[in-house]
Amino acid sequence: SRLKKEEINENKITLRVPSDIKKIYKLFKKNRKQLYIVGGAVRDAILGKSPKDFDLATDAKPDEVLKIAKQGGMKTYEVGKQFGVVVVGGHEIATFRKDIGKGRRPKAVDFSDIQGDVNRRDLTINSLFYDIEKNEVVDLTGGLQDLKNKIVKTVGVAKQRFDEDPLRKLRALRFQAVIGGKMDKDTEIALLKNPSLKGVSRERIREEFIKGIEKGKNSKLFMEALDKFGFTKQMFPQLKLQKPYPNVKSFILFLATILRKNDVKKLPSILNNLKYSNEEIRNITFLVHLKNFKPEKIYDFKKLQEKTTLKKQTIINYGKLIGKDFSKITNFNLSVTGGGPAFVGLKGKQIGDKIKELEKLNFLNESVINEVEPKFQSVHTTSSFEQTFGGWYSKYVPLSTKFMQKMIGKERV
C-alpha cells in the first residue's frame, strides 16, 4: 500500500558500507544467510556521523560463519565463539542470540532469531539493524523514531534491563549526553528507584565517564545528570567535587577542575584505585597541584610538568577554567645548568638549592619585564657586579629592578 511504501522510505538512510563488508555480505547471501550491520554504526549514520567501527549480526551459527568465511578466503578469529561471536576480516560477526544470566559476561547464550537478538539489547537507539542490500533500517523497537526525537529509552521493561546489567544505567546517561536528548519517563523512574552500580567494575565506570565527557554534547549537563541519579558519589568516593561543573571536551581538564579542592597528595592513590592510568594521574595531579604554586617552587613545578604529556595550551586553558593565568609558568623554560662562578665551592644539595634560587630569580625577572616593558627599554649602565661575572650574569640572571637594587646599591637600571 501507499502508507507502507512511505514507512519503508522513512527507514532509508545513507551509510557508506566498506568494501570488505560488502564482500562478506555477498558470501553470506550466496549461502542464503542473513547479515546486518548493527548497533553504533547505524546510530551514528542516522546522526550524520561517519561510523568508525562496524559490528555485524547474522542468523548463521558460529561454525557456519567460519565455513562461509573460509569459502571467501577471509581471515578468521574464534575468540568469543562460545558466546556466538566470530571475527571475520577484522569485523565481529555475532549470531542472533539470547543471553542467559546477568551482567556483561552472560553464563551462556541461546541462539535465536532477529527479534530475540533485538530484545536482549539495552536501548532502542542501539537496537537498529541496517539492511545492506535495501539501504534501510530494520527497526523492531521504535528506536529510529526515538533517535529522531532524541529520547533515550530501554528495550522492554527498564527495571529488567538495568537489573540484568547495572552498567546500562551509565550507558543510558552517556547516550543521553551524546545525542543531547532526554530520558524516557519509565527509564528515568527505574534509574531513580535503583541507582546502585554494585557489580560494575571500576574500569567500565571510568570508560563510560570518559565517553560521556568527551563524546557528549555538554559535559556540564552530563555530570549534573550523574548527580541527579546518585551516581557521582559511587563513581568518585572519597573525593570532593567542585561546582559549577565546566563544559569541556577533555576529561583531564574536567577532572582537574572539579577535583582541585582535594588534597593533591592523596589524589594519585585514589585515582589509581578508580583505574585511571599513570599518565592520566600525572596529568590531573599536576594541574591540581598548580593551586599551590609559588615563585620559589618554579624549578619543582617545571620538573613535574616535564613528566606530564600536557600541551602548553591545555595548561593555559585549565587556568582559564579556574580563573588563573598560568601562561607565564607554562612558557617559562629552565636554563640554569649548575656551572659557573656562582657554584664555586658548592656541593651536593647546595648546588641544587642554588639552581632553584637562580631559576626563581629568572622567573621573577621575566614577570617584571613583562609588566614594565613599556617604561624600561634597556640597561643604561654597567655595574661592577656585571663586569666581574660578564656573560654568565647576562645568561642566567636577567635584570630586574628589585634584584639589581639589592646587588648594586645605588646604580640605576
Language-model features, listed with the residues they occupy:
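Catalytic cores of the polymerase beta-like nucleotidyltransferase superfamily
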Residues: L3-N370
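Intrinsically disordered, compositionally biased, charge-dense segments
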Residues: S1-N11, E357-V413
